[in-house]
A protein has these predicted regions:
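Intrinsically disordered, low-complexity boundary segments flanking structured domains
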Residues: 19-28, 101-102, 136-147
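Residues at the C-termini of beta-strands that transition into short coil/loop
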Residues: 41-42, 116, 160
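Conserved S-adenosyl-L-methionine
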Residues: 71-139
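Short conserved micro-motifs at the rims of enzyme active sites and ligand-binding pockets
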Residues: 48-51, 125, 165-168
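Conserved beta-strand scaffold positions in the cores of enzyme catalytic domains, especially
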Residues: 37, 112-114, 156
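SAM-dependent methyltransferase catalytic region
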Residues: 129-168
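Class I S-adenosyl-L-methionine
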Residues: 1-84
Length: 168
């Protein structure tokens, strides 16, 4: 028994000699549809992501940040306003930054959980510090004041591994 809404619609390509494709209608996906071409003018690039870190920190303390605009685009397509987003490879904290920006933009209440192993103190020195500054506001190296995204909070939990003889 198929109980996940209306049956999906399919069509044949190349007059029946190609493949089968699924037809997606906007009303069935909440008016949002993903495309397979995302130009960097809309989603950013790594150079932009590094410049964003420089605006926040004065330098780029992380080698491979993701563009905030890219993650905002992903979340806009894949979440609703009350989703919980989980990132097990938190890196520089772009996921939380993008979540807070999108919430401010569309009035959402998305929650974001970041997890990292704190290799080279990245969580303490980059991930946490970045998002603390984004929430509280900061001054760029050029002296510009950036207003904080004050309607957010940030909690930091430290965990540890149990030795094998103590685990269940």
């Amino acid at each position: 028994v198929y109980d996940k809404g209306p049956w999906p619609r399919f069509y044949f390509t190349n007059k029946g000699k190609g493949g089968i494709r699924r037809k997606v209608y906007l009303d069935s996906v909440g008016g949002r549809i993903a495309t397979n071409y995302w130009p960097y003018e809309e989603t950013g690039h790594t150079d932009e992501a590094k410049k964003e870190l420089i605006r926040i920190f004065g330098d780029a303390p992380f080698d491979t940040p993701k563009p905030t605009r890219l993650l905002r685009r992903v979340f806009d397509l894949s979440t609703n306003k009350d989703s919980t987003i989980l990132d097990f490879f938190a890196g520089s904290g772009t996921t939380l930054h993008a979540t807070m920006q999108l919430n401010a933009e569309d009035g959402g209440h998305r929650k974001c959980i970041l997890v990292t192993n704190n290799e080279n103190n990245i969580c303490e020195e980059v991930t946490y510090e970045r998002n603390k500054r984004v929430i509280q506001g900061y001054t760029t190296p050029k002296g510009e004041k950036v207003e904080g995204l004050h309607d957010n909070n940030l909690r930091y939990y430290r965990t540890n591994f149990l030795s094998r003889d103590k685990s269940v």
